[in-house]
Curated annotation (Swiss-Prot):
This is Ribose-5-phosphate isomerase A. HAMAP family: Rib_5P_isom_A. Belongs to the ribose 5-phosphate isomerase family. It is an enzyme of class 5 (isomerase). Substrate binds at residues 28-31, 83-86, 96-99, 123. It comes from Rhizobium etli (strain CIAT 652). Its EC number is 5.3.1.6. SUPFAM superfamilies: D-ribose-5-phosphate isomerase (RpiA), lid domain (SSF75445), NagB/RpiA/CoA transferase-like (SSF100950). The active site is at 105 (proton acceptor). Gene3D superfamilies: 3.30.70.260, 3.40.50.1360. The keyword Isomerase applies.
Amino acid sequence: MDAREMKIKAAEAALAHVEDGMRLGIGTGSTAEEFVRLLAEKVAGGFRVEGVPTSERTARLCVELGVPLKSLDELPALDLTVDGADEVDPALRLIKGGGGALLREKIVAAASERMIVIADESKLVDTLGAYALPIEVNPFGLVSTRIAIEKVAARLGLSGELSLRQSGDGEFTTDGGHHIIDASFGRIPDAEALSSELNSIPGVVEHGLFINMAALAIIAGPAGARTLQANR
């Protein structure tokens, strides 16, 4: 079973949690896109959902495949969000934002009664941090914000390169008009402390640590999909 087949297995398992008539947050990334494709097949057969996309990219795919969409202002309370992750630890703490949609992903997840994370087994880790942590920042005062992030990291005993994410024509810009600093800390032993410290920096719009948000993680491997439940 290759990586895409594992993503499809995880998406299939998540789809079993989606009920007719649900208000659904729809994530961003390659695994979430497999979920959208499967959801679209059910919608074509008469299944009713209203989706809120977490990125313009997801919105375009949903429109292309016929998944009905609303804005979060139109559906401010959601039943369920299904989204991928860049890393998942045993406590269902996540690193997200590799696709650049972390702010909207977090807003949509917070507006949902439940969040289900879908991923292949390569994303399951003992401790977060091997994947660079995306930190969404305001373009104004970028150097000052970067220095503040470096100071936070030093206080917490973290080190590693901070890289301003690039795209084909310069700095990567999020759907909200912000930039992303990717922090390669290597290992984050206290994700809660780092989350709190980053939230205290005025120039940090949001970061990719999702803590106490996922209710379930569906992890797919060669033997199939298994479900991890949050213990809190």
